[in-house]
Amino acid sequence: VPEPATTELSPVRLQELLLEHPALDGFLAALACDLAGHLAEWDVSGASITVVRPRRQTVHAGSGPGVSASGQSAADPASGVLTTGLPVVVRHLGGRMRQTAAPGAVPGADAAAFASVPVPVPLAGAGAGGAVLTVYSEHPGAFGPEAVQAVERAAAEAAAAVALALRLDALTHRAENLQAALESRTVVDLAAGIIMAQNNCSQQSAVDILRSVSNSRNVKVRDIAAGVVAVVSDRVSTHFEE
C-alpha cells in the first residue's frame, strides 16, 4: 500500500479509484490511503474505512498494514459511531490504553490520537449498519474541532463513491448467487431427465424421486443430482452469455 501523500479528493479521482479497484475491499483501502493524504495537513498519518451491512461480512480496509488490522472488534471506535451517529474523538491515547485495549481497538499501533466520523451512506433496511471513516495521528492532542470538521467534510465528499462501490458490490454478489443457483438448477434438470428416461416417468415424478433420496440420506438435492449425472457424464457445464 503506498504511503499517504497530499492528495486532492476530486470526483475524477474518486472515479479513477472505482475503475482501478473493482473489488470493494481494494477500493476502500485505496480510498483510505487517499483520504489520509488529503487530510495530512491536519496531522493525519493514517486512515481506515469500516462498512457494516446486514447479512454480509463487515468490510474493513486501511491505508497501511498497521491500520488494516484495526476495526476487527466490538471495541473499535467505529462501533460507537454506528451506535450514536456522532463522531468519536480521542486526542490523547495513552500507552497504557494501547496496551490494554482489545485487538483492533486502536487504529494503528503508533496512534497517539484518533477520530472516527460517520460516512453518510444510506443503506436500505432497518438496522442496516453504515460506514465509518477513522483517521489517526502519531501526535498527541491532534483532532481539535476544526480538524474533526475537516474529517467530516472529507467523509461527506467520499460518501457518493462509497455508495456506488457498495451498490456495485451488491450487484456482483447477487449475480454470483444467481449464477450458482442456475448451475445448481442445470444439474437437477439433467438428473431429472435421466431419471425420466430410465423410469419412463414425468418430470415431477423424477424430481420427487430426487427429493425423496435427498431426505432419506440427508444430502442436498443438488449433490444427489450430481451423482446421478456423474454416472453418464464426467462433467456438467452451464453456459452464460454476459
Listing of model-derived features with the role each one plays in the protein:
Residues P2-H60, C201, R217-K220, E242:
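Helix-loop-beta substructure at the N-terminus of cytosolic sensory domains
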Residues Y136-V151:
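Regulatory loop-to-helix N-cap segments in sensory/regulatory domains
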Residues T6-L9, R13, L19, A23, ...:
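Signal-transducing alpha-helical linker
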Residues A112-G125:
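A short, aliphatic-rich beta-strand micro-motif
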Residues L123-S137:
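Sensory beta-strand/linker motifs that couple input domains to effectors
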Residues R167-E242:
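Signal-transducing coiled-coil/dimerization helices and immediately adjacent hinge/linker segments
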Residues A131-V132, V148, E152-A159:
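Allosteric cytosolic regulatory segments
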Residues R56-H60, G66-A112:
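Regulatory sensory and allosteric helical modules in signal-transduction proteins
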